């Protein structure tokens, strides 16, 4: 868990101190880029709005970490649930990484107060970029991009939980 938080924070601090907001470098062709963006809200840039919305989101994240921690302790003592301990621990590490951004980055980087920091995102994988045909039933002639979200190490830590859930369910 500590490794995920450390890698997450080191990568964010590097991007924050070596890139300009919006700066992008191509790592592998056009499909893997480092693109510096900051997220004011949560997944996919969804915001609760205003000063109190940001505070609510930050306190929700902190409460979620407490609940997830308690959940991990309970799962650790149940042999049927132990296979979920590692994935949930990675989720916990990811949540802690994003909480650090939300609580401290506003003050550390001098752009806002405590609990109003923005989450640093940098990994961008636009695997498919095309224009939809004019006769396409929805969004005819519009630009289409898959995979559009920009994310960070903390965000990526959720993937093992999804994989473990699929493996157990036999999907």
Question: What residues fall within each predicted segment?
Answer:
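Alpha-helical transmembrane bundles and membrane-interface segments of multipass inner-membrane proteins
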Residues: 1-171
